[in-house]
């Protein structure tokens, strides 16, 4: 007798899977979930999944370093773009800031704060530098670390700025892409997965931020407190965050 086909995993199955059962193939092309009173889909990234993805990205960076031993175009410096690039940047630092291979240079990490978008897919009239570049990039091969590349605006702006500071080759490093956009000043892109353009990614650094921004939006579109709670549960929010923030945000947000 034929064995029954295994049941396809649902969105919530993937979100709640324990660390040792992380499905790497799913997270290369993940799908979000629909909720009431919103046109966007939402994709909740658990902490351990964020760590897993950064590890896979670090492996790609290491492979890039090995492939460029002879070209002398190995990455020696990396710029984390705040705020989004801080979490993946710190996770990458754990893998790449030192090395046991004498042919692979350790990467020096720094930061730069840039605001390019007012909201998802909504670029500002002019990008703003919020925090100055913290490391010297003159004549260096530089990795630019972001959490997500949407239209490519931030990455392109930062790459152009770094080149104005004397940087050589620019390599974009990001866990997720929505598109490569019009990236004119970047030689190579290292990433892990693609997400659809209609999907709002909720990384571990912005769980509360997303909740306090989206709950009032749902409320103003007719959602009750109960509907907002159902939305958050459907997205994958843990009960402790819902208990702390939902009612206060709904009533005063």
Predicted feature residues:
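PRPP-associated nucleotide enzymes
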Residues: 1-253
